[in-house]
From Swiss-Prot:
The keyword DNA-binding does not apply. GO terms for molecular function: alanine-tRNA ligase activity; aminoacyl-tRNA deacylase activity; ATP binding; catalytic activity, acting on a protein; transferase activity; tRNA binding; zinc ion binding. Belongs to the class-II aminoacyl-tRNA synthetase family. Transmembrane segments: none annotated. The lineage of its organism: Bacteria, Bacillati, Bacillota, Bacilli, Bacillales. Its cofactor is Zn(2+). This is Alanine--tRNA ligase. The gene is alaS. Its EC number is 6.1.1.7.
Amino acid sequence: MKQLTGAQIRQMFLDFFQEKGHAVEPSASLVPHEDPSLLWINSGVATLKKYFDGRVIPQNPRITNAQKSIRTNDIENVGKTARHHTFFEMLGNFSIGDYFKEEAITWAWEFLTSDKWIGFDKELLSVTIHPEDEEAFTIWNEKMGVPKERIIRLEENFWDIGEGPSGPNTEIFYDRGESYGNDFSDPELYPGGENERYLEVWNLVFSQFNHNPDGSYTPLPKKNIDTGMGLERMTSIVQDVPTNFDTDLFMPMIGATESISGEKYRNGDLEKDMAFKVIADHIRTVTFAVGDGALPSNEGRGYVLRRLLRRAVRYSKKLNINRPFMFELVPVVGEVMKDFYPEVLEKKDFIAKVVKNEEERFHETLHDGESILAEVIAKAKEEKTTVISGVDAFRLYDTYGFPIELTEEYAEEAGMTVDQAGFENEMEKQRERARAARQDVDSMQVQGGVLGEVKVASEFVGYGTVATESNVVALVKNGEYTDSLQAGEEGQLMLDVTPFYAESGGQIADRGYLLADGVKVVVKDVQKAPNGQNLHKVVVEEGTLTKDAAVKAVIDTKNRSSVVKNHTATHLLHQALKDILGTHVNQAGSLVTSERLRFDFSHFGQVQADELEKIERIVNEKIWESIDVAISQKAIEEAKEMGAMALFGEKYGDVVRVVQVGDYSLELCGGCHVDNTASIGIFKIVAESGIGAGTRRIEAVTGKSAYELMNDQVGLLKEAAGKMKTNPKDILTRVDGLFTEVKQLQKENESLAAKLSNIEAGNLTDSVMTVDGVNVLAAKVNVADMNNLRTMMDDLKNKLESAVVVLASVNDDKVNILAGVTKDLISQGYHAGKLVKEVASRCGGGGGGRPDMAQAGGKNPAQVEEALAFVQEYVKSVSK
């Protein structure tokens, strides 16, 4: 067996399958594009669903990839086991209706055993198959020469994740030798069992059935191959190390952590070894996820990242690291992965900044968690229990990121324990929710539909022309082929030549008409068909449209003109954002219509008003410079060398379309654009907002829409100036003057209210009653708000020196209640917080506070007098 690095194994796998006629699919972003069913890309096949379910027909039915993936369903096991990871790479080869079992098995065996490739000893390999898969048994036994005793039949060798493609699978295992297990009385010591000796190398899935909604299985019209080989596990076997963490994919991060901590990995302390592993795993995940646009937050993907970072920081304390340090490991990850993922090093500064910021926040959160825990302990003592509930412990862990181990330590210091069973029960509930979510999202669509069968050519020529003489080459109604569409009927069609742009890259589809003698057809929408043709959604307004009809296809040029202005403006905006906010800005989505443009982008924090102003000015300056827009076809590598931006979620072929705005903007784009920026006219930002963790959105208008917006704003300005009896240019001065007048009136009003309050407070002293030797005052007063109530309360307490006072006011059907107790009475057991809570409850409200002063609110003004009457009862109850 050869000595290989993890990077060499990855490249060798891809090279092997390229030799077998496979197209290499680039590793997709971890953040799923147009697949809301997934939180993360979690397998090699996840990005290929569109091919397997027939929505898109790949140019090459043979595909191979090395796909970065994230799975977080077993975070607690990371570091405890030899092979659990949150981030991993899955190597795979796939066949979409092309080759099947024999080729898949033959090539897998060749890659693993040939001296040209991995070079495993055949005698150390065993395989598992489904008990009824005689075809796989025959191939393994008769063609590959695997002895019967090393072909194990297991019922679980059937891949099925719900509705959609399913089928038997075969797994290949490597025997690592007796040092990893030689107790043959162990019922799990066999290939496919739970043991450390026989490691699964490769899983080959033969998708040959459809799992139907009624639970039945029917043969697929096209049989598929889906295989997966974990790079980390394969590397541990090739490098002959005990765990994945001991490979060159993890050791550089572990080594860097050793340098930071002064501790040593594999020095006899299992707890410290686990800490090293957790840190190495989690920094890989966070680095790649942030690089792909995810940012820490309290929801969704962001919450996963926050949880991973906090778990790593917690484990770092076992290595005596008590400061932010994970950010220092980001460039180490970049160096390890630079051969296949050079973008990590390119983004390392931004990723490190995000990680450091989150670490610093967690160190602050630890203090917050301590405060919450102190309240939990105090509450438990008040309830005379020595056990912190599992629900409270889980809330600290899940909401505040407070480690259960720390909760146990604090509890022990307070002479208490934690309900571990209750905590584990809450954890299991969370796992069940995660498992249910995964089952819901992993199933694929069922194959079918006539559109996937349409192979006729349809050429898009709309970059250079707005009308064509075309022929209807395919006509569909209600999902089935048809020969004609009558007036009033809707359908879908393909043209041999079309000027209509199909929606993609954020740009909406063209609208327009198909015209012929006596026939008028409205084109409402255009989308890409599974085989890449432009598919027109139409409704017949006049006449009858037939298949093979000759028509004139005409787009709505007014609509297209507005769209292209917004599209080119989007490119200018993208570059301006990078100029002002930083190179970390990446497109996270866009919408380009005739009315407006919407641009979503990655950015950590709100865009400030002065930044927006600069961004808007840059875009307008580029418009006013009248820059020519050049469009060319380039080889993908040449385009990247030129510095062209490749956009989020887009797939590119060997030859790409490059859109260049002078020397300012350079992007790969298949959309429609103006010839010169001057055509855009003007650019105006309408709104900026946050739409999720680390993602911002800018909405803007150009051209006529921008003119109309500014006209409306000028009109509003003139109207406001008229009402203020001033000129538009003097309106700010007038507004400042009005603010000054309002502030002066507020001061006068407050002064008058204070005087009235003092007068009313003076009159109230005549209403003081003595209850069991205690001065008691409970009154409804006429004041504007709680602040005036407090002023009156302070005045009364000073005048009365010793008293229990409750004041209530009603404004706009809202009840304000304030209770006060002088210091001498607090020591006798009187408590303003408890009193105000009781009073408020009697008029539909609630509240509380300190022993000397407390406030509350109520909802039923009619019950205020009755509520105040309770004050005497309260005083009597305390004085007993």
